[in-house]
Regions:
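Short, internal active-site loops enriched in acidic
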Residues: 71-74, 312, 406-409
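Hydrophobic, well-ordered secondary-structure elements that form the walls
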Residues: 290, 304, 314, 375, ...
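PRPP-dependent phosphoribosyltransferase catalytic core
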Residues: 320-409
Length: 409
């Protein structure tokens, strides 16, 4: 009995392409995109679906998953994840702007995607992280404080000049340009966000008259306002006609996880090669991007699992976070022990050269020729480097790891 395609598994490739409707007898291509209409797409789905299913089962109720993907399967990945995780648990899509494609045919592709899904979005907390840019301002303030002592006026002037010179780098926190004896702050909004806020009298410290009340009322209860005034956390104008303003302290500045992130794709390769060797692994994950994501969703004691660990960027990132935050975050890496020897036999051009370099590198350290061994060596070297860079704070930092190997069944 015939099926959709002729049930003849011994036919030649050319005959199969004709029989399946991909080419006619004259050799003209009938399918506009062969790779998207056959085994290529099916193989990809067969590979990714069970992994995403297992990942969901392993997530805690408040867990999240980040999946990096390019244009080729982004649309299909979204459909698969909607089915497995539920469209209501789609948390967002991050556009990762990377290095420019120097040889575009039509459109210059400069980005990839990171899809994010929650196990249960309804119970997710708000995602905030300490602002890295705010730390730059704090470091400059401390430098000026060391130089000028308690000369607040000079410190504020110098800090504002520095912020203007670095406006692009400090985008999002450049409004933190006021200084008092407690540190750096910006003036916030005292008005309530909607009508119906608190209304009570606040007397100006110099004129003694009642200060102007916002149309929507104050956003703080009267007791909170009194405490803020007592602690010097309210700015008054020259007289009572100017609205008072709360001081928003630099140390409380938070980042939100934005949907567009710029990352020079070459930086992750440079970082990897500085630790390991040149041209032994293509496109390692960026520890900078991983760190940014983890800062928003990973807490002390959590477990981070990477289903495609590759060069073990996730392990290095977690060890760095543990050193930086004095935390105890754990990681589990999953990687098929892909034979680099087999890759070398079938690869071409740059990929073949990379495989050759990887084989030489693994020979130099006496390890088998697999992707896993590259990742394991990176963990060893990254752990050693972290301890050497910060010997006083990493005495108790655990940089060891165990390996579980699954045999074929």
């Amino acid at each position: 009995k015939d099926f959709i395609y002729g049930d003849n598994f011994s036919e030649k490739a050319e005959d199969y392409l004709i029989d399946s409707g991909q080419y006619d007898e004259q050799g003209n291509q009938l399918e506009t995109n062969v790779e998207s209409n056959g085994r290529f797409h099916t193989d990809w789905l067969n590979m990714i679906y069970p992994r995403l299913k297992v990942a969901r089962d392993l997530l805690t109720d408040n867990g999240v998953i980040f999946i990096s993907i390019d244009d080729h399967e982004q649309e299909n990945l979204k459909k698969v994840c909607d089915e497995i995780y539920g469209s209501a648990n789609f948390t967002g899509c991050i556009v990762l702007q990377t290095a420019t494609d120097n040889n575009p045919r039509q459109i210059n592709t400069e980005h990839e995607y990171i899809l994010c899904y929650s196990k249960n979005k309804a119970i997710q907390d708000y995602w905030y992280a300490d602002s890295e840019k705010a730390k730059l301002i704090q470091e400059k303030y401390l430098e000026l404080l060391q130089k000028y002592g308690q000369d607040i006026e000079t410190i504020q002037r110098e800090l504002r000049n520095w912020i203007k010179e670095n406006a692009e780098i400090l985008k999002g926190v450049s409004h933190y340009d006021n200084v008092d004896e407690k540190g750096v702050f910006h003036d916030g909004d005292i008005a309530n966000t909607v009508f119906g806020g608190y209304k009570y009298d606040v007397h100006h410290p110099i004129t003694g008259k009642i200060c102007k009340i916002p149309d929507k009322g104050f956003r703080y209860p009267e007791k909170t306002m009194r405490d803020m005034i007592k602690n010097g956390e309210i700015m008054f104008g020259d007289d009572e006609t100017t609205l008072i303003k709360p001081k928003k302290r630099l140390e409380n500045a938070k980042d939100v996880l934005r949907s567009v992130i710029y990352e020079d794709g070459r930086s992750s390769t440079k970082q990897f090669e500085a630790l390991m060797a040149r041209d032994i692994f293509q496109n390692p994950k960026s520890t900078t991007i991983l760190s940014r994501l983890f800062n928003f969703v990973v807490e002390d004691g959590d477990i981070v699992m990477d289903f495609f660990s590759g060069s073990a960027s996730t392990a290095e990132c977690i060890m760095n976070l543990n050193e930086k935050k004095h935390s105890n975050i754990h990681y589990i890496l999953v990687q098929i022990p892909e034979s680099i020897d087999k890759v070398f036999l079938t690869a071409k051009d740059k990929a073949k050269k990379t495989a050759q370099n990887a084989i030489k590198f693994l020979d130099s350290i006496g390890k088998p020729h697999t992707i896993c061994e590259i990742g394991k060596e990176r963990i060893r070297r990254a752990g050693k480097k972290i301890k050497e860079d910060s010997p006083l704070t990493t005495q108790d930092l655990d940089t060891g790891f165990r390996v579980l190997k699954l045999d074929s069944s």
